[in-house]
Amino acid sequence: MAAMEANIFCTFDHKLSIADVGKLTKLVAAVVPIPQRLHLIKHYQLGLHQFVDHTRGYVRLRGLLRNMTLTLMRRVEGNQILLHVPTHGLLYTVLNTGPVTWEKGDALCVLPPLFHGPLARENLLTLGQWELVLPWIVPMPLALEINQRLLIMGLFSLDRSYEEVKAAVQQLQTITFRDATFTIPDPVIDQHLLIDMKTACLSMSMVANLASELTMTYVRKLALEDSSMLLVKCQELLMRLDRERSVGEPRTPARPQHVSPDDEIARLSALFVMLRQLDDLIREQVVFTVCDVSPDNKSATCIFKG
């Protein structure tokens, strides 16, 4: 793709004040998502403002962000901004717009900002009814933890009153990562979170069905080769579960004689597909890898991986 096509110009309908230009200049090198890749866009297409709805769930906003085009703010020119669509494998200076510090080697992901707690997003720029809302750029472990807790809270809230859920998940809503503490919003059970919960339940049911019989066979064999305490304890646990299921029922052999090698391999393959599906629910795409962090930790030199 030609270099010129990687540049996007954003114009403002009203003349920017000196203060507004100053605010935007401080955001040079920030990651700015846009809905689609066009050569010329308007300011209201910048960031997440057009999709923010405080009556709807965080999972919805996260899904929309995943489908947006990521750009880097290059410079402010009069009444317009120059954005650049990064190229895979190239080095870029990236501004840290998230709540936590970065470290060399971090795999960074984009997440919508949390709108609750002591580290809720700051006001970057407001023009009339429009406000610039930028994503958080956070290390992968933090993104996984946020997404996992959102899913756990959603599943836990099924068939429970708001009061029960609020009391039980309070400890899940506060996350501390690298000395930064912030709050996950209450789960909103909308169609977006429902899809994730349905996928999780289907995958977990398949894992529970496929894993038990296969795991018992393999753990028993491994325990003969390696008498480590973990394997022994694992075998004891599986045998106890097997006995509990088998009370009053005919004894089932560890590996049913009618299961062919092809069938066993098919079951194993299906099991790992389900495990990957569970992982996909909480994993974010890595967009940058940190090569070097600035002394003030406000930016870093990164390789674009998106």
From Swiss-Prot:
Chief place where the protein resides: virion
One GO MF term attached to the UniProt entry: structural molecule activity
Subcellular location: Virion; Host nucleus
Family: Belongs to the herpesviridae TRX2 protein family.
Function (record text): Structural component of the T=16 icosahedral capsid. The capsid is composed of pentamers and hexamers of major capsid protein/MCP, which are linked together by heterotrimers called triplexes. These triplexes are formed by a single molecule of triplex protein 1/TRX1 and two copies of triplex protein 2/TRX2. Additionally, TRX1 is required for efficient transport of TRX2 to the nucleus, which is the site of capsid assembly.
Subunit text: Interacts with TRX1 and major capisd protein/MCP.
Name recorded for this polypeptide: Triplex capsid protein 2
Biological source species: Human cytomegalovirus (strain AD169)
Gene that this polypeptide is encoded by: TRX2
